[in-house]
Amino acid sequence: MAMAERPRPGWASYQNPNINNCQDMGNSILLLLGLIVCINIGINLVTLLWSRIRILLHRMFHIICEKETSTSLGKLVQPLRKQTYPKVHLRCTMDPVKMTVTPPPTRRRYRHRAPPSRRARCPIAWAPDTDDEKPPHQHPAICSRHWNDSKDWEGFQSMQEVWEPWTQDGLEQPPQTIRFQPAVEARPLKSEIRSDQGLEAYVYTVNPPPPSPEALSHKNNAAGSGGCVEGEQAQGQPVSPSFLGPANVPEIPRRHSSGRIVYDARDVRRRLRELTQEVEALSHCYPLVSGSSAAEGTGKDWVYRPLKGR
């Protein structure tokens, strides 16, 4: 019985390692559960305190960035102080003259042009031409811009016969600052004036030079032999003294003033009216002789023909 009660040493050695393994497995499981609990608690704390943690992190990064920028600027200022260059200020300006002022041809393109009949009646503002070195052939006798219509020229031809004796002997220019050009092909004596602004005008002489006897004899010979009887009647009349009066200057219509007028238009119109009144007052001094009577050669230096009947 004593032998049966003794434990066997093999069984004891066999049971001891199993108990130790079980204890180790339980301890490891407890450790894992503890770690899981700790992680869960940490996550809960972070979620609860995230707003405050975010503010703290923002302040920390802001302070760190300011320190870095201050140190970088301090390093850049030192080499700039060693090499100092003068400051350059660039100022862009625009020339107002080039923006506003345009040449006269460009203005004429956008301006409403009147019909040729109206443009022929209106006078053009002009300035005296002081450039005497230019040859006279550069300026045409008739302005194509103002005499486009045939009707205007027909109305203007009424003055031709009055100026015919003077156009043939009009080579001598009167002592004036304005350059005059003689007529071509029995056209009225006139001159074309061009100002600096591109304006054009025609000026007629009031007292042109008297015609030479040769010009009158040439005209009398060309008149023909159709008016011999009238020439004899004209010879019986007393010969008036060779007095050269002012020419009949046509009335210039009123024109709207513009910024380009260089002279006083009212003064010019007033002088022209005085000249016309003087011509009417002295009209009785001029004998009314027809064109056929001049063919006989009465010895007169001039022939006056009124324009009222034309």
Curated annotation (Swiss-Prot):
<dbReference type="Pfam" id="PF15670">
    <property type="entry name" value="Spem1"/>
</dbReference>
<dbReference type="GO" id="GO:0007283">
    <property type="term" value="P:spermatogenesis"/>
</dbReference>
<keyword id="KW-0812">Transmembrane</keyword>
<feature type="region of interest" description="Disordered">
    <location>
        <begin position="215"/>
        <end position="238"/>
    </location>
</feature>
<comment type="function">
    <text>Required for proper cytoplasm removal during spermatogenesis.</text>
</comment>
<feature type="coiled-coil region">
    <location>
        <begin position="262"/>
        <end position="286"/>
    </location>
</feature>
<protein>
    <recommendedName>
        <fullName>Spermatid maturation protein 1</fullName>
    </recommendedName>
</protein>
<dbReference type="GO" id="GO:0007291">
    <property type="term" value="P:sperm individualization"/>
</dbReference>
<keyword id="KW-0217">Developmental protein</keyword>
<keyword id="KW-0175">Coiled coil</keyword>
<keyword id="KW-1133">Transmembrane helix</keyword>
<dbReference type="GO" id="GO:0016020">
    <property type="term" value="C:membrane"/>
</dbReference>
<dbReference type="GO" id="GO:0030317">
    <property type="term" value="P:flagellated sperm motility"/>
</dbReference>
<feature type="transmembrane region" description="Helical">
    <location>
        <begin position="29"/>
        <end position="49"/>
    </location>
</feature>
<keyword id="KW-0744">Spermatogenesis</keyword>
<dbReference type="GO" id="GO:0005737">
    <property type="term" value="C:cytoplasm"/>
</dbReference>
<dbReference type="InterPro" id="IPR031368">
    <property type="entry name" value="SPEM1_N"/>
</dbReference>
<keyword id="KW-0963">Cytoplasm</keyword>
<keyword id="KW-0472">Membrane</keyword>
<keyword id="KW-0221">Differentiation</keyword>
